[in-house]
């Protein structure tokens, strides 16, 4: 059975949210306040990290935030990076900041994450923010899960009592999005199943899902025979795969085999233009919360 699917258009929704944030910033300025300030720390010249950081800086401009970028070469020491984090923690003009991951092998990522002041941790990676999320307290929620849930909210996707299968158990997407959709209220109140590389019967589990969130990082893993008619599919995957027809030689591919899965869905996110833009705009909304003093 084929259904006519609708796109969960992250590009469109993120544009609407940017306008809402820009309006709040204008209000702040009219009342004599200052622009929210997001700082980013970038180590080395990883292509993906450069692209992400550039899109974050651009989004700051679009919503009227101040942004600053602190760059280090690959050979930066852990001590230097920790000192930078400490300076940003202490700087009253910086509302929130992010340290772009991955970091070089000689630096302990967890140590850096835990050095960030939870009140400025707009990436939502600090154990205190992760813990607050798990017990339903206000805190900074990691940007991708926050963006996914906001996308479901804006499209009025019913979640209460629905079976949601999350493919992937990463600390950045799989675990937090499961926590969010488990919480009381809409979007939330889901029955959650998390599948991962050791789950033996992923296909059977997926066939019972009303909502599937694919966050494995395996291109085109989810195929049509794994999806029941009318399901909602959210594709978090972003893998560059070789494509000789493209000028760059690559194309961005999700974890879902879009062309064959989409006709079975009620709603599905495209890649690109689905979850990606929602991630960036969620970072902006976290920064706005930080500037208002989420923890105060």
From Swiss-Prot:
Pathway: One-carbon metabolism; tetrahydrofolate interconversion
Catalytic activity: (6R)-5,10-methylene-5,6,7,8-tetrahydrofolate + NADP(+) = (6R)-5,10-methenyltetrahydrofolate + NADPH; (6R)-5,10-methenyltetrahydrofolate + H2O = (6R)-10-formyltetrahydrofolate + H(+)
Keyword Transmembrane helix: no
UniProt-listed Gene3D superfamilies: Leucine Dehydrogenase, chain A, domain 1, NAD(P)-binding Rossmann-like Domain
Keywords for the protein's UniProt record, in alphabetical order: Amino-acid biosynthesis, Histidine biosynthesis, Hydrolase, Methionine biosynthesis, Multifunctional enzyme, NADP, One-carbon metabolism, Oxidoreductase, Purine biosynthesis
GO CC entries: cytosol
NCBIfam families, per database record: PRK14185.1
Record's protein name: Bifunctional protein FolD
Species, as recorded: Porphyromonas gingivalis (strain ATCC BAA-308 / W83)
